[in-house]
């Protein structure tokens, strides 16, 4: 599946195929899960998905940056950024390896 971008529609179709919900129910389920993740992140909570990874909101302080074209210094305001940290299980699965004696293919 290298090179392909997975969309919400693809996720909904996978739920439809594997779980047996209707297409409308599958789409609603995907939207609900993604919406809840967004709500948690926007309120500053960390989202941890076992065997997948963690989404964390981090604060970045004010700093001085440079316009790469002109070299002029610009003040960059403080902001929140979202960071994804993959689990060791996901890293191993991507790299085709093993983690803690488990095959990367095994579902937990």
From Swiss-Prot:
UniProt xrefs under PROSITE patterns: HISTONE_LIKE
A GO cellular component annotation in the UniProt record: cytosol
UniProt entry keywords in alphabetical sequence: DNA recombination, DNA-binding, Transcription, Transcription regulation, Translation regulation
Cystine connections: none
InterPro entries reported for this sequence: Hist_DNA-bd, Histone-like_DNA-bd_CS, IHF-like_DNA-bd_dom_sf, IHF_alpha
GO molecular function, one term: structural constituent of chromatin
Pfam families: Bac_DNA_binding
Annotated NCBIfam families: PRK00285.1 (NF001401)
Family assignment from sequence similarity: Belongs to the bacterial histone-like protein family.
Name under which the protein is recorded: Integration host factor subunit alpha
């Amino acid at each position: 599946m290298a090179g392909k971008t997975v969309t919400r529609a693809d996720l909904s179709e996978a739920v439809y195929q594997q779980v047996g919900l209707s297409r409308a129910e599958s789409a609603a389920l995907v939207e609900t899960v993604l919406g809840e993740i967004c709500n948690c992140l926007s309120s500053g909570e960390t989202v941890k998905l076992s065997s997948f990874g963690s989404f964390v909101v981090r604060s970045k302080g004010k700093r001085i940056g440079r316009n790469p074209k002109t070299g002029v210094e610009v003040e960059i305001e403080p902001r929140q950024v979202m960071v994804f940290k993959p689990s060791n299980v996901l890293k191993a699965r991507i790299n085709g390896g093993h983690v803690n004696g488990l095959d990367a293919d095994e579902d937990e």
